[in-house]
Amino acid sequence: MLGPFSVDTYLPAFPAIQASLQVSAIEVQQTLTAYMMAFAFMMLWHGAISDALGRRNIILVSLFVFAVASLGCAAAHTIHYLWIFRILQGLSAGAGMVVGRAIIRDIYSGPAAQRLLSLVTMIFSIAPAIAPILGGWVVTLTDWRSIFLFLFIYTGGLIWFCFRYLPESLPKEKRHEFSIPVLVKSYKAVFSSPSFYLQSGTVAFNFAGLFLYVASAPVFLTQHLGLSAQGFGWQFVPMVSGIFLGALGANRLAGSIPLFQQVRIGYFFLAGAAVCNVVYHVIFPPAIPWSVMPLFFYAIGMSFVAPGVTLMTLDLFPNTRGIVASCQSCAVTFLGAIVAGVIAPILENSPVWLAVGQFGFVLCAMLCWHQSKKAHEKLLTH
């Protein structure tokens, strides 16, 4: 939940940060890009380090670093210092996401792992719903710095909980030596696999279609829909409700229907929502609730697709699942950083172009899945 909190909580504070530090809106948005780029880069290392040193140790150290970075963000008096500490947050925030998936796969397999991953998605979906609403209240009642103080306190609670209750799922005899040549060899194997690109692309492009609206929220909600900082829940509650319901559906269906059929159901929601989003904004002006309703159904579809495809990706290299999880998360987050830093600023001034951008991401994801499915079926026939 740390990742969503560190992204979504401070979005309502963008105008306040801009006024406080006397910078442009683009410079404030680059704090999100800096975080995402650092997050993506470190994704490549969290899993590899956890494969060598154990899952629990990496999570505890990364939480401590994130807590320090949150204090730095709260104390930043220039945009440059805020960029630096957001980078430090990004370097540490992803450990729970990557290592957590590896822990699940260490202990469980098959439908049980798929169900647990869906359950984790449901629990984690609470954060993006609460975060922007909480951020809006905080920035209205106090100031934007209090948001980062909240993140510091929240992280302290996580450190205590993990230190006391989180077990080590990777015993020493199953760990791999942390060696640069070994890492290069492992990364080369993963990044030379066409199936990895196709399956990671499936998840990444689906996510990008939703994250486009997350990155554009300060403009989409305040300028196009006329909402205040306290109105961010109008977008994030439907999105997160969709993630929760989609993950619940995926959890219930895991093992009951073939994975490919579950993905097909997911794309029925994804494609339908994206098409309706484009059609509505071409014909009508943006308005609540119609402008955010497609995001609800889009999120349902995304959560139907992600668990099964993620497990397929992890099983491409069973002996180095930590590294595979890192590479997949890096791909997803790197695309998210491009969306936040390049695509969202270009498209966010027009609700129609935002909808078209989301539709384009769905088409890319469907193409990746189609090619991945063909490759998988071809492998099974040989």
Predicted regions located by residue number:
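Conserved MFS/SLC helix-loop-helix module at the cytosolic interface between two early adjacent transmembrane helices
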Residues: 41-79
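Paired small-residue
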Residues: 65, 69-72, 80-88, 289-295
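Helix-loop-helix hairpin linking two adjacent transmembrane segments in secondary transporters
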Residues: 81, 110, 118-164
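A late C-terminal transmembrane helix in Major Facilitator Superfamily
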Residues: 311-348, 357-358
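Helix-breaking motifs and short loop linkers at transmembrane-helix boundaries and internal kinks
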Residues: 20-22, 54, 75-81, 92, ...
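Juxtamembrane intracellular "pre-TM" segments in multi-pass secondary transporters
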Residues: 169-200
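Cytoplasmic helix-loop-helix junction between adjacent transmembrane helices
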Residues: 85-126
